[in-house]
């Protein structure tokens, strides 16, 4: 704030010059100090593309973010280019509020940390700041894991923090059999649900059959409408040999499969279904 006025820095592709000017005018009339771009390289200011100028302007814009209380992203039709993506990550790291012209999928913890790595590689943030970013990332990741582990149901439970689902899966089951691009799909979700189904019997075959029966009778409609399903079969003995039988009832679904051993002396089996809508 400066003399009671909020300071807002505009970010986005300079191809949206008209939207920049309209937003600058509107936010100014709402009583804000607005910092915008100085040149529109994608809208006719060709000097931007001469040697050294674009790098200078990119560094300047990070300084403009430092001056602001908030950034406002001009993302017409949801478009966010690489430079803007890095500016969003930088603003988040610096604790700035972030608003968007249009509703869009917000970057994840992992997206922002990767973008900060690009800024560090380009020499635009210091070793010290990147080290701090890494520590912040670890703290937020651990908080997301704690959120995941603290959730007890009742199921299905709608997750407000999709990061919590991903972090929980990674933390509880490791990266084995999970492809990064599969996990990435979770962030495209409108909502993410988890259902946990406990087997009821004293032997593996009957345990898995009771789980399959529950899936078919209670969950197939929602599963059929999902974009992706993450299936984790947990058993007191190695459950990997039972995946084929389980997969028969999910034929045609986009599924990531994984197993986990339960450390218990009792005969037990549980299925986690995380499905993305």
What kind of feature is each model-predicted range?
Residues 1-112, 116, 137-141:
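Conserved catalytic or regulatory cores that recognize and/or transform ribose-phosphate-containing ligands
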Residues 123, 128, 132-135, 139-277:
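Tubulin/FtsZ superfamily GTPase core signature
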Residues 80, 119, 172:
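Generic anion/oxyanion-binding catalytic loop in active/binding sites
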Residues 108, 115-118, 206, 241-242:
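Acidic/proline-rich low-complexity IDRs
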């Amino acid at each position: 704030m400066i003399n009671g006025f909020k300071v807002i820095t505009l970010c986005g592709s300079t191809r949206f010059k008209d939207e920049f000017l309209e937003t600058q005018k509107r936010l100014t009339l709402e009583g804000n100090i607005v910092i915008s771009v100085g040149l529109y390289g994608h809208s006719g200011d060709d000097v931007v593309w001469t040697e050294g100028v674009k790098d200078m302007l990119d560094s300047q814009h990070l300084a403009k973010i430092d001056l602001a209380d908030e950034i406002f992203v001009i993302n017409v039709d949801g478009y966010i280019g690489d430079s803007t993506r890095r500016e969003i990550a930088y603003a988040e790291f610096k604790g700035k509020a972030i608003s968007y012209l249009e509703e869009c999928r917000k970057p994840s913890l992992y997206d922002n940390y990767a973008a900060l790595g690009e800024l560090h590689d380009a020499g635009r943030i210091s070793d010290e700041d990147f080290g701090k970013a890494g520590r912040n990332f670890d703290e937020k990741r651990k908080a997301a894991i704690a959120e995941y582990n603290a959730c007890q149901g009742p199921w299905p439970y709608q997750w407000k923090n999709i990061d919590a689902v991903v972090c929980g899966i990674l933390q509880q089951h490791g990266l084995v059999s999970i492809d990064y691009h599969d996990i990435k799909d979770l962030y495209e979700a409108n909502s993410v649900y988890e259902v946990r189904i406990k087997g009821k019997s004293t032997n593996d075959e009957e345990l898995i059959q009771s789980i399959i029966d529950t899936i078919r009778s209670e969950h197939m409609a929602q599963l059929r409408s999902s974009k992706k399903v993450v299936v984790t079969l947990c058993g007191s003995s190695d459950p990997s040999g039972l995946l084929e039988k389980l997969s028969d009832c999910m034929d045609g679904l986009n599924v990531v499969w994984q197993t986990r051993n339960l450390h218990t002396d009792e005969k037990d089996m549980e299925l986690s279904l995380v499905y993305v809508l």
